[in-house]
UniProtKB/Swiss-Prot annotation:
SUPFAM superfamilies: P-loop containing nucleoside triphosphate hydrolases
The organism's taxonomic lineage, starting at the top: Bacteria, Bacillati, Cyanobacteriota, Cyanophyceae, Synechococcales
Database matches in Pfam families: Fer4_NifH
Source organism, top-level taxon: Bacteria
Binding site for Mg(2+): S43
Originating species: Synechococcus sp. (strain CC9605)
Membrane-crossing segments per the record: none
NCBIfam families: DPOR_bchL
Gene designation: chlL
Name used for this protein in its record: Light-independent protochlorophyllide reductase iron-sulfur ATP-binding protein
Family: Belongs to the NifH/BchL/ChlL family.
Residues the entry annotates as binding ATP: G39, I40, G41, K42, S43, T44, K68, N209, R210
Biochemical pathway: Porphyrin-containing compound metabolism; chlorophyll biosynthesis (light-independent)
Length: 296
């Protein structure tokens, strides 16, 4: 059951969504929440990272936490129905569902779930995330999983869409080398600072995406205590993989650019498995970011 409480120690008195402790994912599972500015490539990053973990022999579950339910289509090669849609079909009697009703097998055995969400302007996305985890636990689908990846909607950091942080060991932030992406990243750091007071989630690092250079990201990292875990340039093969509805690991291996991207994802996955040192980053005030970034 999901409850809404007011807890000043978590988010400076804002209304937060807190999950039932019974919904906690077992300690031995690596749980990663992927955040970033809307449209920055979180789903691409999440799906390719899931594929990389699977290539390393891990049992992987990816949970899309966006009403658009497009997180996993490069893994499954199709748009799959959402948990909220399936629950509506059975009038929210979850006991009537079977795992195959809402869990779909994708590339290299990656298990895929799209939580979906309430209609625009209504309901709470955090509730839907909680219901998804509850379903997975009821059907014992988390017991045989090594890695869980939450792919989270845009840069929304309200109590609802911060809910995956309550399950995660690490948060990865996807960003480009521009002001808007880094500004959004700073807000996400603030959300993680709030959640880390009461939950185990810690910052894992930054994924630089669609960027030839990282000078602005490097400035921000140095000032806040973040680090870049992986760097993906604006490679056309990544764009083409989305159009082909597949992961980067299903593209032509003979292409050196494809190989480079594959290797970077494998390196990132291995680093996360090696239990990276969590970061104690400090967010900046809006004016500080404005003064820090850019050129004199």
């Amino acid at each position: 059951m999901t409850t809404i409480l007011t807890r000043p120690a978590d988010g400076e008195g804002s209304v937060q969504v807190h999950q039932d402790p019974a919904l906690n994912i077992q300690e031995e599972t690596l749980v990663i929440a992927v955040y970033g500015k809307g449209g920055i490539g979180k789903s691409t990053t999440s799906s390719n990272l899931s594929a990389a973990f699977s290539k390393l022999g891990k049992r992987v579950l990816q949970i899309g936490c966006d009403p658009k339910h497009d997180s996993t289509f490069t893994l499954t090669h199709k748009m799959v129905p959402t948990v909220i849609d399936i629950l509506e079909e059975v009038d929210f009697h979850s006991e009537e569902l079977r795992p195959e009703d809402f869990v779909f097998t994708g590339f290299n055995g990656v298990q895929c779930v799209e939580s979906g969400g309430p209609p625009a302007g209504t309901g709470c996305g955090g509730y839907v995330t909680g219901q998804t985890v509850k379903l997975l636990k009821e059907h014992h689908l988390l017991e045989d999983t090594d890695v869980v990846i939450f792919d989270v909607l845009g840069d929304v950091v309200c109590g609802g869409f911060a809910a995956p942080l309550q399950h995660a060991n690490y948060c990865l932030i996807v960003t480009a080398n521009d002001f808007d992406s880094i500004f959004a990243m700073n807000r996400i750091v603030q959300a993680i600072q709030a959640k880390a007071k009461n939950y185990k989630v810690r910052l894992g690092g930054v994924v630089a995406n669609r960027s030839a250079d990282t000078d602005q990201i490097d400035k921000f990292n140095e000032r806040t205590g973040l680090r870049t875990m992986a760097h993906f340039r604006d490679v056309d093969a990544i764009r083409r993989s989305r159009l082909k509805k597949c992961t980067i690991f299903e593209m032509d291996d003979a292409d050196e650019a494809v190989q480079a991207v594959q290797n970077e994802y494998l390196r990132l996955a291995q680093n996360m498995l090696d239990k990276v040192e969590p970061l104690e980053a400090t967010s900046l005030k809006d004016r500080e970011i404005f003064d820090l970034l850019g050129f004199d």
